[in-house]
């Protein structure tokens, strides 16, 4: 009889532990679920960072420089452009650069030769040393990507101060525009004028035209807020998918936040500085110390003010 009572107590004791274990298991699941929900919210916030609204008055956003190097179908450097974006001041500085600029790394090689022997990273080093600046990002841009991006924006209206005429040896890539004739240039026409010897000033004329083209295209993009906002991803992919770049998708998303905010200001933020110096012949250009100082001063003037704060969302 006593043995039966003890057995009965053991059974009751075992049964009483089951609900405790069940409650513990449910609590554990709920805790894990809460952790998962918090993680999901954090990931979602980071993934949608590009849709955030930036409060520039309380946020430190440093300006950034990107070097775009246009290469032809034979992977030869055609020209390049330094683009500095200052979100805080809503300014974009464009510095067009000839591929025949002599690099300060050795005082002999041109940027085209530097790219041919060392690729885009060595070119970035040469550009930084030659102009006395620091570029944060680099990207190679194919002829097709350049034309496509220019066409998405819609080209730009151009009236040359001299007749531009050139008969191409291949593919009917001719250039023919009358003096003072206002025409809307397509991406292909812009590219051809950038690379062919159509200017009386020689290759300096090509560099100046490149500055005019990029400045006009970017300002046109800022005049078309909805079109540009909806096309940013497309243009990024055209450059990134087929080019060499250190601009990651996350870097691009962060930049897109600032660019969208600048677009909403409805301004034309872009201006250019044309490199000054000396052409010793048609294939060697040396940047003057005076221009390097001017560029340094402009870089200093377009630095962001150091402030504290975070990107805020509404």
Label each region the model flagged.
Residues 65-76, 86, 97-108, 233-314:
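C-terminal solvent-exposed extensions
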Residues 151-232:
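Flexible, polar/acidic helix-loop-strand segments at domain edges
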Residues 79, 120-128, 143-147, 151, ...:
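Extracytoplasmic/secreted envelope proteins and their assembly/folding machinery
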Residues 91-118, 162-168, 172-174:
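Flexible, solvent-exposed short loops/turns enriched in glycine
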Residues 51-54, 63-71, 78-80, 109-128, ...:
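N-terminal post-signal-peptidase region of extra-cytosolic proteins
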Residues 2-94, 259, 266:
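Entry/capping segment at the start of metal-dependent catalytic domains
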Residues 61-63, 75-80, 89-94, 122, ...:
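Extracytoplasmic
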Residues 117-179:
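Amphipathic, coiled-coil-like alpha-helical scaffolding segments used for oligomerization/assembly
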């Amino acid at each position: 009889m006593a043995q039966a009572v003890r057995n009965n107590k053991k059974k009751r004791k075992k049964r009483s532990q089951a609900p405790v274990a069940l409650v513990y298991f449910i609590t554990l699941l709920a805790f894990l679920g809460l952790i998962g929900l918090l993680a999901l919210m954090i990931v979602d916030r980071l993934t949608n960072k590009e849709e955030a609204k930036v409060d520039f008055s309380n946020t430190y956003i440093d300006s950034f420089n990107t070097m775009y190097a246009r290469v032809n179908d034979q992977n030869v450097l055609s020209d390049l452009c330094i683009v500095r974006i200052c979100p805080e001041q809503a300014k974009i500085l464009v510095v067009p650069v000839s591929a025949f600029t002599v690099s300060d790394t050795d005082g002999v090689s041109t940027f085209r030769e530097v790219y041919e022997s060392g690729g885009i990273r060595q070119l970035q080093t040469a550009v930084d040393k030659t102009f006395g600046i620091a570029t944060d990002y680099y990207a190679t841009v194919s002829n097709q990507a350049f034309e496509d991006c220019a066409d998405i924006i819609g080209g730009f209206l151009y009236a040359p101060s001299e007749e531009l005429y050139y008969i191409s040896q291949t593919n009917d890539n001719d250039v023919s525009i009358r003096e003072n004739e206002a025409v809307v240039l397509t991406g292909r026409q812009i590219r051809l004028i950038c690379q062919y010897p159509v200017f009386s000033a020689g290759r300096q004329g090509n560099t100046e035209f490149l500055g005019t083209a990029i400045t006009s295209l970017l300002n046109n993009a800022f005049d078309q807020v909805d079109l540009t906002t909806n096309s940013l991803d497309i243009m990024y992919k055209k450059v990134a998918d087929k080019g060499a770049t250190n601009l990651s998708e996350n870097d691009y998303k962060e930049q897109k936040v600032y660019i969208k905010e600048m677009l909403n200001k409805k301004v034309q933020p872009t201006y250019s500085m044309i490199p000054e110096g000396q052409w010793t012949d048609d294939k060697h250009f040396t940047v003057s110390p005076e221009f390097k100082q001017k560029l340094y001063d402009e870089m200093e003037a377009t630095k962001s003010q150091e402030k504290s704060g975070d990107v805020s969302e509404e």
